Amino acid sequence: MLAFQQRGTIIAGVSFDIPGMGYKNPRTGLIEGFEADLARAIAEKLLGAPDRIDFYQITDEKRIPALQSDLVDMVLSQLTITPDRAEQVDFSIPYYITREGLLVPKGSDIKGLDDLKGKRIAVTEGSISLRRMRASLPSLPGATLVITPLSFGNLEAVANGEADAASNDMINLTMMHRASDHPERYEIIDIGDRFDKKPFGVAVKKGNHPFVDLLNRAVEALKGAGEIDRLFNKNLEAAGSRSA
């Protein structure tokens, strides 16, 4: 029997700062968002009830260490499946595939990756976007990175004039844009044609193959039933209503 089965609850590491993805509602204290709802749906599949879940706040750079130190059973926090990460943790099949994007002020002269020359780019510590932007710097003379601990800090850096653009997953940027106080002030640019796609997987501690098998079956069933699409669309709409 796996640890979460003995305990009767799954401890899930999720973001608490991204409306629509993983977000702690300051009014209710509830953890909301697409990945939080997906974690509940997985708990229902594996333990019989969606409330058999405990949420643990995770930041990008702490996602893998939290699994390695047994702070959490699984991570659903926009963790892109990459070969080097797969050497450190095990992944389920992808539950969502996104692309690289930029968020810029409305009317910005930034229309694509090459326009970031001489610009300040906000990225999240521990993210694939940080890796990609750092690797792109030699071809972007004068560009600098503004590194934030949380993804929502990307948007805040642009809003406060501390960055000219934010680089993040298209799904994160879309959710944050829709949930912002003034979505009309920003626009999102898809630069996914310049980079590999970003498949998100549920991550677990390395070597926990029985848990991966259970997660794969759960994700496959939720996909097949259209539940993952439903949860995504529900939270996309809810993120937009926050700024209405």
Regions found by a protein language model. Give the residues of each.
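A ligand-binding cleft/hinge motif common to bilobed small-molecule-binding domains
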Residues: 62, 78-87, 132-137, 159-160, ...
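Extended ligand-binding regions for polar small-molecule ligands
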Residues: 1, 37, 41-46, 114, ...
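Extracytoplasmic small-molecule ligand-binding "clamshell" domains
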Residues: 1-75
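Periplasmic-binding protein-like
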Residues: 96-104, 178-220, 236-244
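Short coil/turn segments
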Residues: 16-17, 29, 80-81, 105-109, ...
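Ligand-binding clefts/hinges and TM-proximal coupling segments of bilobed small-molecule sensing domains
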Residues: 128-146, 184-187, 219-244
